[in-house]
Curated annotation (Swiss-Prot):
Source species: Caldanaerobacter subterraneus subsp. tengcongensis (strain DSM 15242 / JCM 11007 / NBRC 100824 / MB4) (Thermoanaerobacter tengcongensis)
Principal cellular location given in the protein's record: membrane
Protein name from the UniProt record: Protease HtpX homolog
Subcellular compartments: Cell membrane
Entry keywords, A to Z: Cell membrane, Hydrolase, Membrane, Metal-binding, Metalloprotease, Protease, Transmembrane, Transmembrane helix, Zinc
EC number, as in UniProt: 3.4.24.-
Designated gene of the protein: htpX
Family: Belongs to the peptidase M48B family.
UniProt cross-references to PANTHER family, sorted A to Z: PROTEASE HTPX (PTHR43221:SF1)
């Protein structure tokens, strides 16, 4: 396997992010054009569709981190109440050579964490209250180092944009299914041709089947190797693979799913937020294998 430098990995993540944006814009235009045609909105509809796509891409690039944090109910971690967490984040950021990210906490008993943002200067790390309660200092440091690796490697923009894209794909599926179920545009359908109702029905059914598959394909770009790389890089940052290994062992033993778990954002977390439940869109490598690899590292 050809070894790549950190800068090459960062450049690859940026390229993939832009590729996702372009491909998704084409998909969105195709779906939107069907609505424009079906409701006979003409050139006005096409103009509004183009504006929507541009606006959505801007939101995905500039505001996706805020959307991700809001979607899980994350709040800024008070520096006095969570002074140990802030101290660890600052230490690890210094060791990783990146600016200290903003620190967030989500009220969730499952031990977990994720990083988000468009670049290291605009990054955030979020941990659950369950993680803070369950981990000792070395274990928490290992988890933070893992997330800091995603920030340093510029994984965060790609992961966050994919989450927003996946969320909209699921939303589009639901819109079609509701349109099919409630017969939105019924008068227009009867005025045009009854066959259009059949077309809408087929599109809704097809989307309901392929939307999760599209999500899976998109998220497959968030390779499992990225998690292995972040594990190893994090261990080297803090010069200790055993803290993260111990943390992953505790995380793996917690079997209850996250209350706010979503298939759109699952890949962002350090561990599968659905717990031990096997589901179609799993993006994380087995925790047992991650622990094994960490313990085999020589630092």
């Amino acid at each position: 396997m050809t070894k790549r430098t950190l800068y090459e990995l960062q450049a690859e993540n940026v390229r993939k992010t832009y590729l996702f944006i372009v491909l998704f814009s084409l998909i969105l235009f195709a779906v939107g054009y069907f609505f424009v045609w079906y409701f006979n909105w003409g050139i006005t509809g096409i103009i509004f569709l183009a504006i929507f796509i541009v606006l959505y891409n801007w939101i995905a690039y500039e505001q996706s981190d805020k959307i991700a944090l809001t979607s899980v109910g994350a709040v800024p971690a008070d520096p006095e109440k969570f002074y140990v967490l802030h101290n660890i984040v600052e230490e690890v950021a210094l060791a990783a050579g990146v600016p200290k990210p903003k620190v967030y906490v989500m009220n969730e008993p499952q031990p977990n964490a994720f990083a988000t943002g468009k670049d290291p200067k605009h990054a955030s790390i979020c941990v659950t209250t369950g993680l803070l309660q369950m981990m000792n200092r070395e274990e928490l440091q290992g988890v933070i180092a893992h997330e800091m690796s995603h920030i340093r490697n510029r994984d965060i923009l790609l992961m966050t944009v994919v989450a927003i894209v996946a969320g909209l794909i699921i939303l589009l599926r639901d819109v079609f299914l509701r349109s099919m179920w409630w017969g939105i545009g019924g008068e227009r359908r009867r005025d045009k041709n009854d066959n259009l109702g059949i077309i809408l029905l087929l599109i809704g059914l097809i989307l309901s089947i392929i939307a999760p598959i599209v999500v899976l394909i998109i998220r497959s770009a968030i390779s499992r190797q990225r998690e292995y790389l972040a594990d190893a890089t994090g261990a080297y940052i803090v010069r200790d693979p055993y803290g993260l290994a111990s943390a992953l062992e505790k995380i793996g033993n917690y079997t209850r799913p996250m209350r706010t778990a979503s298939s759109a954002t699952a890949h962002m977390f350090i561990s599968n937020p659905f717990g031990k439940v096997e589901y179609l869109f799993a993006t994380h490598p087995p925790i047992e294998e991650r622990i094994k690899r960490l313990k085999s590292l020589t630092i």
